[in-house]
């Protein structure tokens, strides 16, 4: 059965492991992304070089913005990028196509870059500047933007990395010479340039592999949640007595007045923290400094997160598919109607999970999976062999439904996978499938609930 890069291109997965690359799925995006801090924190010369290339481009953007060169044409040329979907990472609802970086991001970033990177190249508190700082200011730049921007700036490195492996390990019949757009930046021409590569090629597109040791899950090492959560400790560590006193004084003023012995809510504290950071952006530099001083922690946490994704979506899914092949006719159901196929497959899933130890693959370190998003990805990865089109979470105007299974426009069944632990399970059962069936123009709907006793 073909699910992963190694399956589709006929190589041993151990070859990827030896090379240091993640064995991506070519069925659905997996929830990982590049953390630029891992380049900075690495001792590898090639990673240090890529970190410096990112800083060089940020310096270029800042200098142009300071000269007022941030009109619509330059924003389009220098800030707007398509998602590098060929790496098969991210949180795409269907397959591997995300939204990328549009004009809204470009305007937000270009108008604030001189504030975010005020000491770029002249750092006194921190060792270096970091792209992730843009996500710490309230300027409309989120972690998804940081991820897409990082991947585009590392595009040439990733393509070289993939080409080197492909030429050595993959049969030539699976390779193709591809002219890739916007690969490297020419500082003389001040434009992004294309470049040719020999790459793995399937379904009318090339594929990119990524080193595991620059990947993470959920959050970058430098992130706004840690900034807010560690606010008091960070500010306490500031050695400048006057600055530290001014910060805490301003923070107290930003908290709403309360009666004696009445505590502030977390929402009130978060709002006051954000106002204080806007007033004293120096706080961010001290936060980044602490992060820089814990490179080992960044590496260790990222490794654990990547290993978790590998366990859930590669090792466990592979074992689950083997169980389905051995214990059921899951992949042998004749295509009669979308409803029949969906129902039969769900019954097979139920039987293998409950009676053939399949449930064990939904546990990690003795704990059941807690995110429905993970359950949905697992479901799609096991369904790939169907003759029917299975689209994950289509949004037809009424909100997302987990799957719409169809054999042409006249034969559709909506399928929802839910965890019994979901606090909104009752509301979902009462309303959502009916609404989704109407939105998807079908009378067929199935809800499957995974319950851990």
Name each region found by the language model.
Residues 1, 351-453:
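Catalytic core segments in nucleotide and nucleic-acid processing enzymes
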Residues 1-48, 267-290, 300, 304-308, ...:
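N-terminal start-of-domain structural block
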Residues 1-178:
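Long, contiguous, compositionally biased segments that the model treats as domain-scale units
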Residues 62-65, 154-169, 346-356, 379-387, ...:
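Hydrophobic, Leu/Ile/Phe/Ala-enriched alpha-helical segments that form helix-helix packing faces
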Residues 117-135, 309-323, 407-435:
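Generic detector of solvent-exposed, compositionally biased contiguous segments
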Residues 175-187, 399-401:
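Beta-rich nucleic-acid/ligand-interaction surfaces
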Residues 184-385:
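The feature marks a conserved, polyanion-engaging helical scaffold used by nucleic-acid processing enzymes
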């Amino acid at each position: 059965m073909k699910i992963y890069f190694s399956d589709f291109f006929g190589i041993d997965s151990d070859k990827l492991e030896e090379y240091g690359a993640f064995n991506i799925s070519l069925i659905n995006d997996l929830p990982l992304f590049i953390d630029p801090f891992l380049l900075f924190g690495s001792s590898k010369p090639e990673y240090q070089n890529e970190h410096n290339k990112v800083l060089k481009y940020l310096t270029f953007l800042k200098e142009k913005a300071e000269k007022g060169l941030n009109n619509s044409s330059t924003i389009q040329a220098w800030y707007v990028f398509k998602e590098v979907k060929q790496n098969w990472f991210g949180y795409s609802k269907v397959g591997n196509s995300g939204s990328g970086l549009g004009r809204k991001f470009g305007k937000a970033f270009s108008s604030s870059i001189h504030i975010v990177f005020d000491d770029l190249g002249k750092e006194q508190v921190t060792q270096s500047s970091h792209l992730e700082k843009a996500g710490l200011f309230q300027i409309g730049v989120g972690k998804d933007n940081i991820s897409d921007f990082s991947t585009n700036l590392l595009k040439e490195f990733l393509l070289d990395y993939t080409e080197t492996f492909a030429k050595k390990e993959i049969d030539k019949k699976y390779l193709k010479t591809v002219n890739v757009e916007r690969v490297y930046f020419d500082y003389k021409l001040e434009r992004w340039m294309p470049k040719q590569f020999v790459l793995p090629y399937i379904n009318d597109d090339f594929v990119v592999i990524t080193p595991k040791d620059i990947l993470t899950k959920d959050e970058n090492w430098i992130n706004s949640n840690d900034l807010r959560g560690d606010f008091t400790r960070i500010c306490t560590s500031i050695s400048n007595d006057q600055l530290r006193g001014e910060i805490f004084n301003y923070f107290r003023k930003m908290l709403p007045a309360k009666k004696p012995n009445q505590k502030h809510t977390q929402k009130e504290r978060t709002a006051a923290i954000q106002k204080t950071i806007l007033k004293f952006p120096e706080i961010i530099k001290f936060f980044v400094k602490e992060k820089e001083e814990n490179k080992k922690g960044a590496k260790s946490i990222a490794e654990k997160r990547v290993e978790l994704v590998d366990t859930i979506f590669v090792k466990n899914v592979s074992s689950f598919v083997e169980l389905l092949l051995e214990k059921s006719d899951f992949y042998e159901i004749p295509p009669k109607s979308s409803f029949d196929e969906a129902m039969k497959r769900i019954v097979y899933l139920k039987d293998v999970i409950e009676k053939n130890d399949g449930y064990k693959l939904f546990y990690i370190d003795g704990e059941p999976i807690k995110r429905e998003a993970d359950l949905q990805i697992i479901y799609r990865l096991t369904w790939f062999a169907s003759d029917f089109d299975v689209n994950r979470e289509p949004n037809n105007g009424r909100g997302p439904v987990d799957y719409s299974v169809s054999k042409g426009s006249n034969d559709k069944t909506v399928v929802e996978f839910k965890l019994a632990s979901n606090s909104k399970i009752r509301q979902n059962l009462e309303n959502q499938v009916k609404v989704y069936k109407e939105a998807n123009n079908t009378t067929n709907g199935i809800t499957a609930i995974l319950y851990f006793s």
